[in-house]
């Protein structure tokens, strides 16, 4: 079982303890860590909606360290990011692979960042199917439709052409932070929080 650090805050009513993620949520920071799956996606979407309700004009920071995961779960987070009123900044710490890289790219323009030693990976969706030939054929058609949709999302957020995106995503394509900036997944490589605050000032 993973240990979650607790922090203690002094108030005029005494002490109050929070788990570290709840305390950071008060600062409008959300962590997207680990595999992207339905339960995790629901928690991230709920936090985004909560922070929108608290203040629809104040930005939200999404910190990403994820190997990717289920496409539909990732698209639930993506759609919520686009749906809510606050601008969502994204910051890759560690890695943003597969759906993680799409969510990194989906941050508000000029507010998409990565730390210098981050790794970003983009690729086409994959899936394994078994059953009758007709069912496999339907699954294949569906995954091709999903591939086109994901390509369109990368085109929208990176400024690359559809052909460039399709070619790059044909196989696992790994990038360091500088390469991710050149490709359009992020806007800036950050070495210090001061640079992030300068961008948003």
Curated annotation (Swiss-Prot):
Organism: Rhizobium johnstonii (strain DSM 114642 / LMG 32736 / 3841)
Active site per the UniProt annotation: 98, 123
NCBIfam families assigned: clpP, PRK00277.1, PRK12553.1
A Pfam entry, by short name: CLP_protease
Protein name per UniProt: ATP-dependent Clp protease proteolytic subunit 2
Annotated EC: 3.4.21.92
UniProtKB keywords: Cytoplasm, Hydrolase, Protease, Serine protease
Subunit relationships: Fourteen ClpP subunits assemble into 2 heptameric rings which stack back to back to give a disk-like structure with a central cavity, resembling the structure of eukaryotic proteasomes.
Highest taxon listed in the record's lineage: Bacteria
Keyword Hydrolase included in the entry's annotation: yes
Location of the protein in the cell: Cytoplasm
InterPro entries, per database record: ClpP, ClpP/crotonase-like_dom_sf, ClpP/TepA, ClpP_His_AS, ClpP_Ser_AS
One of the record's GO molecular function terms: ATPase binding
Family statement: Belongs to the peptidase S14 family.
Catalytically driven reaction(s): Hydrolysis of proteins to small peptides in the presence of ATP and magnesium. alpha-casein is the usual test substrate. In the absence of ATP, only oligopeptides shorter than five residues are hydrolyzed (such as succinyl-Leu-Tyr-|-NHMec, and Leu-Tyr-Leu-|-Tyr-Trp, in which cleavage of the -Tyr-|-Leu- and -Tyr-|-Trp bonds also occurs)
GO biological process terms, semicolon-separated: protein quality control for misfolded or incompletely synthesized proteins
Gene coding for it: clpP2
